[in-house]
């Protein structure tokens, strides 16, 4: 007798259910997507005990006839595709015809459905077996109640996480699907209590204000872009806002919530230099592409998609994000350049000291005393335009700038580092960074491997205005440096050069020039701990205004923090 046998239908359904129904949220996903495909304008999702004991989805969609409802409980029974060609042009969320059969095979299910013109139907199913079929006198739409999930597959229950985890997954999914369809009203009920109801008025911004706290609302940039058959729109976080160590993305392709590395990498590259490595921005992104150019049939849960034109999608998303961030920074500087108040008189040092004594503020407030000049450009000092007032410097690193209704706190090192980075990058693009011969050459010790590396990249480093010569078997003598470092002491020059050696020692040399520019910018910028005079602070702020530079240092740290009068009044409960 042969060893190969056909598995019984009940066992086949349970195996198939393992791919489609991984956990309670899988049930919610499949049922809600069916409701959307049925044209529902209102969907109510209820669950209890993390979805293990109860999941119910009610909609006002087109409903099913008795014949269709019974047929839909069979695998591969669907109204959404009919031919192989349909598989490559899918416009619905569901299409395989597996969901209801898979869910019914591992639970106790009650299905009620009614169309506009025909009588309704009630079907009771246990473990994939139909137990009862009757008439149902309800409203147009569908009601599906799933209870005792995995009651007949106890091994599957063991792999479920805690009730709190399963609950959070369901809440997160309903939020995500509600964002994708703001024109549909969603109600979520957890353990008998309503969590939220969305209005279903199509207003996405209003929906975001309902689902997220005010911190999220105030930190988003809206954008939209169209190129040929591609369209992208949505919201991304402002540089320095809402960043996290894990991805916090809401990606939708043709209104389908997906995970996709192409989109994720394009967004991260768009934020490059505006966010720290290893961190993620907040994003809600709707990408529309021709249905024929996206394959949604690459994963059992349909969460992953594959693009026919991967490179074009990547470049389109990257450009869109970069342009949105550039535009936001332009707006920021335009708003800063046009305050609505007249310039205030600066207080003298003695007046500020008196104010400190009266208020007894616990701040290291050092107005306008200098230990190191910001730039030789201070000698060409031009006062700030009217409407701005530099309050002073705190903690030897932060400049406080005031306008009529806002306060700006500026990290002097990070801001100057960005300025130097942009200047050096521009000089390198023009093909010339000015160098200068130093009076006392700096001798540093190097290993044999480092000497080989320096010889290999000698031409590149000379483009950055460094020049050196051998000084024995294990030493080199630096004789020329960029003009920016003329007045640096030997230890500072050695530290910079060692950092550059570290840059060229890394295996990934694809972005070597950028790494070297970042190192040079960091070392040439005014340091944290340098006390600045007023003219130096004003010169730094003027350079920020004039260059319209990104609002982060080259490594992605924000250098400016805007606090509105409204924010302060809200904090002190004045509004």
UniProtKB/Swiss-Prot annotation:
What the entry lists under SUPFAM superfamilies is as follows: ATPase domain of HSP90 chaperone/DNA topoisomerase II/histidine kinase, DNA mismatch repair protein MutL, Ribosomal protein S5 domain 2-like
The record's keywords, sorted A to Z, are: DNA damage, DNA repair
* Cellular component, GO annotation: mismatch repair complex
Which Gene Ontology terms describe the biological processes this protein takes part in?
A: mismatch repair
Q: Name one Pfam family in it.
A: MutL_C
- InterPro entries according to UniProt: DNA_mismatch_repair_CS (IPR014762), DNA_mismatch_repair_MutL (IPR020667), DNA_mismatch_S5_2-like (IPR013507), HATPase_C_sf (IPR036890), MutL/Mlh/PMS (IPR002099), MutL/Mlh/Pms-like (IPR038973), MutL_C (IPR014790), MutL_C_dimsub (IPR042120)
Entries under PROSITE patterns matching the protein: DNA_MISMATCH_REPAIR_1 (PS00058)
Q: Origin, by domain of life?
A: Bacteria
List the CDD domains. HATPase_MutL-MLH-PMS-like, MutL_Trans
MF terms from GO for this chain are:
ATP binding; ATP hydrolysis activity; ATP-dependent DNA damage sensor activity; mismatched DNA binding
State its role.
This protein is involved in the repair of mismatches in DNA. It is required for dam-dependent methyl-directed DNA mismatch repair. May act as a 'molecular matchmaker', a protein that promotes the formation of a stable complex between two or more DNA-binding proteins in an ATP-dependent manner without itself being part of a final effector complex.
Family note: Belongs to the DNA mismatch repair MutL/HexB family.
Q: What is the protein name stated in its UniProt record?
A: DNA mismatch repair protein MutL
- The organism is Dictyoglomus thermophilum (strain ATCC 35947 / DSM 3960 / H-6-12)
Which gene codes for it? mutL
């Amino acid at each position: 007798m042969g060893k190969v046998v056909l598995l019984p239908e009940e066992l086949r359904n349970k195996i198939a259910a393992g791919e489609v129904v991984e956990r309670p949220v899988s049930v919610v996903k499949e049922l809600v997507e069916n409701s959307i495909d049925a044209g529902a304008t209102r969907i109510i999702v209820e669950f209890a005990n993390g979805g293990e004991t109860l999941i119910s989805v009610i909609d006002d969609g087109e409903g099913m006839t008795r014949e269709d409802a019974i047929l839909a409980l069979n695998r591969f029974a669907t109204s959404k595709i009919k031919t192989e060609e349909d598989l490559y042009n899918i416009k619905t969320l569901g299409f395989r015809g597996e969901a209801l059969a898979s869910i019914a095979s591992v639970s106790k299910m009650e299905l009620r459905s009614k169309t506009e013109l025909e009588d309704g139907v009630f079907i009771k199913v246990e473990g994939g077996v139909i137990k009862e079929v009757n008439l149902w006198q309800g409203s147009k739409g569908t009601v599906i109640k799933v209870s005792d999930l995995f009651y007949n597959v106890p091994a599957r229950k063991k792999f479920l996480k805690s009730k709190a985890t399963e609950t959070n997954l369901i809440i997160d999914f309903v939020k995500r699907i509600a964002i994708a369809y703001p024109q549909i009203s969603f109600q979520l009920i957890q353990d008998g209590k309503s969590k939220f109801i969305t209005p279903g008025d199509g207003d996405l911004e209003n929906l975001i204000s309902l689902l997220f706290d005010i911190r999220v609302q105030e930190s988003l940039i809206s954008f939209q872009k169209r190129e040929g058959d591609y369209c992208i729109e949505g919201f991304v976080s402002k540089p320095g806002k809402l960043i996290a160590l894990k991805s916090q993305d809401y990606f939708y392709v043709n209104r389908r919530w997906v995970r996709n590395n192409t989109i994720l990498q394009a967004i991260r590259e768009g934020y490059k230099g505006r966010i720290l490595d290893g961190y993620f921005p907040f994003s809600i992104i709707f990408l529309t592409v021709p249905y024929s150019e996206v394959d949604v049939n690459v994963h059992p849960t349909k969460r992953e998609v594959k693009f026919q034109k991967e490179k074009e999608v990547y470049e389109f998303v990257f450009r869109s994000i970069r342009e949105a961030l550039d535009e936001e920074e332009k707006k920021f500087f335009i708003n800063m350049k046009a305050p609505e108040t007249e310039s205030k008189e600066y207080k003298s040092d003695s007046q500020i000291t008196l104010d400190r004594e009266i208020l007894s503020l616990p701040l290291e407030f050092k107005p306008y005393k200098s230990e190191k000049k910001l730039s030789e450009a201070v000698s060409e000092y031009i006062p700030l335009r009217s409407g701005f007032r530099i309050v002073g410097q705190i903690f030897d690193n932060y400049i406080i700038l005031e306008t009529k209704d806002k306060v700006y706190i500026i990290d002097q090192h990070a801001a100057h580092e960005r300025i130097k980075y942009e200047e050096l990058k521009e000089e390198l693009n023009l093909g010339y960074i000015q160098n200068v011969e130093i009076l006392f050459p700096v001798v540093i010790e190097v290993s044999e491997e480092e000497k080989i590396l320096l010889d290999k990249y000698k031409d590149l480093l000379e483009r950055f205005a460094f020049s050196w010569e051998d000084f024995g078997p294990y030493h080199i003598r630096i004789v020329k440096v960029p003009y920016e470092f003329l007045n640096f002491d030997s230890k500072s020059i050695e530290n910079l050069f060692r950092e550059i050696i570290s840059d060229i020692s890394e295996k990934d040399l694809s972005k070597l020039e950028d790494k070297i520019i970042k190192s040079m910018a960091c070392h040439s910028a005014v340091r944290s701990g340098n006390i600045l005079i007023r003219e130096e602070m004003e010169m730094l702020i003027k350079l920020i205004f004039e260059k319209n530079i990104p609002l982060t240092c080259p490594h992605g740290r924000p250098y400016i923090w805007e606090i509105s009068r409204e924010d302060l009044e809200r904090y002190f409960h004045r509004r």
